[in-house]
């Protein structure tokens, strides 16, 4: 399922126009993104948690030259599925 499919599903299930559903989906994504950018955790009970995790600095290797390089520490978004979502997928 891609974003267009998601918008169509939301429009059908919530009895909205595709434009309204698109605005709702965009608002949800933007809210999650803004919260993560502030370092906040987003908890959606039954669905899962979005959070920012620290990735440690590490050594890597350039695949073209084989030369070792330093990869700096970074922050990455992460998602952990909730129990209801895990059970639905089983």
Swiss-Prot record:
Keyword Protein biosynthesis belongs to the record: no
Superkingdom assignment: Bacteria
Pfam families for the chain: Bac_DNA_binding
UniProt keyword DNA-binding, yes or no: yes
Alphabetized UniProt keyword annotations: DNA condensation, DNA-binding
Protein family per UniProt: Belongs to the bacterial histone-like protein family.
Organism: Staphylococcus aureus (strain Mu50 / ATCC 700699)
Disulphide-bridged cysteine pairs: none
SUPFAM superfamilies named in the record: IHF-like DNA-binding proteins
Self-association and partners: Homodimer.
GO molecular function, one term: DNA binding
General function of this protein: Histone-like DNA-binding protein which is capable of wrapping DNA to stabilize it, and thus to prevent its denaturation under extreme environmental conditions.
Coiled-coil region(s): none
Protein name from the UniProt record: DNA-binding protein HU
Gene symbol of the encoding locus: hup
GO cellular component: cytosol
GO annotation, biological process: chromosome condensation
């Amino acid at each position: 399922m891609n974003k267009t499919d998601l918008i169509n599903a939301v429009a059908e299930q919530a009895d909205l126009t595709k434009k309204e559903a698109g605005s709702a989906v965009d608002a949800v994504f933007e809210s999650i993104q803004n919260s993560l950018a502030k370092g906040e955790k987003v908890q959606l009970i039954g669905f899962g948690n979005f959070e920012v995790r620290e990735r440690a600095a590490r050594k890597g290797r350039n695949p073209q030259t084989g030369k070792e390089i330093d990869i700096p520490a970074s922050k990455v978004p992460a998602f952990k599925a909730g129990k209801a979502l895990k059970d639905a997928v089983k």
